[in-house]
């Protein structure tokens, strides 16, 4: 009997250790079409819903906005644990509704895009358990690291990452949205290089 109890305890511990985390980063900078186009916001919300629906009981979803480093609203990070009571459908509904509401919100746009800072300083990615970091962003870093126009024109690249994201899937939904193909290629190449140096597996979704 004791042996059975021990086996069950170890099994539960193993399952807990393998729980994945889905971190959803929402770009509130003014260049992101998410803030101005309802159709884009809807498509982004549907993609997020699909990813949430892949999760299992015990997995974690955390949501955080980013843009300007001095904006207090970016400090909040609502966190949900998938369970029998809190199913993926409910979590997806809450987050989807928020994303779709963004184009209707006034004065929400922030003047800069600190995407690198978000990736390097946000805690809880849980990359050791093959988790995912899903960014809803046009991927135009516009910060003290590099100006947006410099990046888009290929005049200056992204700095070397100061973070270990080995084991994480890093997905950018909306990379280069609304920009010409040449700019999209530059952004994709830069973020692919940055992600590889950080140890992450990078995917760009260009709707």
Where are these regions (language model features)?
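Von Willebrand factor
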Residues: 19-129, 132-134
